[in-house]
Amino acid sequence: MIYLKSANEVAGIKKACAIFKAVKAYFTIEKLLGKKLVTIDRLIKQFIEQKQAKCAFHGYLGFPGFNCLSLNQTVIHGVADQTVFKDSDKLTLDIGIDYHGYLCDAAFTLLGNKADPKAVKLLNDVEQAFSKVIEPELFVNNPIGNLSNAIQTYFENKGYFLVKEFGGHGCGIKIHEDPLILNWGEKNQGVRLQEGMVICIEPMVMTDSSEITMAANNWNVLTLKSKFNCHVEQMYHITNNGFECLTN
């Protein structure tokens, strides 16, 4: 079921998203390098709770962490452990925030100061995809297949590979709502964007292969053959004249 949000609901969701933006601004690479993932997870939890909000992912479907911290070969859904975030690493922070029942789900990727140039280029390409190909597709009555196809075409033309098994989704009242928004698809297929939709769009991109596997903890989604990967997630509100990005 697709939940079309009222103006009051969008206002509440924006408050949750404002906390995400504060998390992203505060937790810079300089603050996090050298820390264990479990420490980073707790620091973000404390920051969110100081804003009178909760970590939405904790306990969701049994998830044991507070936030998804995906280091290096982990693409998404990483559970924080004792591993230290080092200068050569990639760390994706996927943050779920529950502010009095209004939800934000968004992610950003950080690279250490000694990250491989290929990882740097990948992150730049993923971040630029939002303004170059995603946002031009965000308008009322556009089929979601057009958005999915635009994402697929952009990344495949650059020689990248996309995670096929996971995608974006509706959000705001529940963590995962309809519609499913895959990062691949055919034009003119799927439901059409409607005014009042709040959606998460999240390219999950790899350099060498689209193959993934599940870690022994049944949470961390790992690359199987790809050396580098990147995941960025933004939330959008579809309006009568286009969109609002709620998380950037």
UniProtKB/Swiss-Prot annotation:
Entry note: cofactor: Binds 2 divalent metal cations per subunit. Has a high-affinity and a low affinity metal-binding site. The true nature of the physiological cofactor is under debate. The enzyme is active with cobalt, zinc, manganese or divalent iron ions. Most likely, methionine aminopeptidases function as mononuclear Fe(2+)-metalloproteases under physiological conditions, and the catalytically relevant metal-binding site has been assigned to the histidine-containing high-affinity site.
Q: Which Gene Ontology terms of cellular component type are present?
A: cytosol
Q: What reaction(s) does this enzyme catalyze?
A: Release of N-terminal amino acids, preferentially methionine, from peptides and arylamides
List its EC numbers: 3.4.11.18
Q: Name the cofactor(s).
A: Co(2+); Zn(2+); Mn(2+); Fe(2+)
Q: Which SUPFAM superfamilies match?
A: Creatinase/aminopeptidase
Can you tell me which residues bind a divalent metal cation 2? 105, 169, 202, 233
Q: What top-level branch of life does the organism fall under?
A: Bacteria
Tell me the protein family, please. Belongs to the peptidase M24A family. Methionine aminopeptidase type 1 subfamily.
Complex and partners? Monomer.
Entry protein name: Methionine aminopeptidase
Native source species: Mycoplasma genitalium (strain ATCC 33530 / DSM 19775 / NCTC 10195 / G37)
Which lineage ranks, top first, belong to the organism behind this chain?
A: Bacteria, Bacillati, Mycoplasmatota, Mycoplasmoidales, Mycoplasmoidaceae
